[in-house]
From Swiss-Prot:
InterPro entries: Ribosomal_bL19 (IPR001857), Ribosomal_bL19_CS (IPR018257), Ribosomal_bL19_sf (IPR038657), Translation_prot_SH3-like_sf (IPR008991). The keyword Ribonucleoprotein applies. Belongs to the bacterial ribosomal protein bL19 family. The keyword Ribonucleoprotein applies. One of its GO terms (biological process) is translation. GO terms for cellular component: cytosolic large ribosomal subunit. Keywords: Ribonucleoprotein, Ribosomal protein. GO terms for molecular function: structural constituent of ribosome. This is Large ribosomal subunit protein bL19. This protein is located at the 30S-50S ribosomal subunit interface and may play a role in the structure and function of the aminoacyl-tRNA binding site. It comes from the Bacteria. PROSITE patterns: RIBOSOMAL_L19.
Amino acid sequence: MSKLNKTILADFEAAQIQRKLPEFNQGDTVVVNVKVKEGNRERVQAYEGVVIGTKNAGLNSSFTVRKISHGFGVERVFQTHSAIIDSVEVKRRGKVRAGKLYYLRGLEGKAARIKEDLAAAAQAKAARQAAAKAE
């Protein structure tokens, strides 16, 4: 690929990456609000679960969220820059050491819990208070 084509492709990707999502990592519990089209109307559906993996590849970035629904594990892969994602909210910061949490697939009940990262939660709380004070 020539240098000109690479710069054109990079400019196109930069234009497509427009929306900023909150920072989240593996182990964090997130709520992903997804736009669902049913017939001629559109609604927003919440999908809450634990982020078990992320793939950072520019415009092709994605993340995988796992939740337990009616006793069964359900995983969904979301494209980070997709138009169907309305918003992402981080509910809880998890403290994990692994990059991919695929081992959670084999665990059930209390064994599948993830410890909360209290230091990150305290920093987020301080940031919210500082923002409220500035207003």
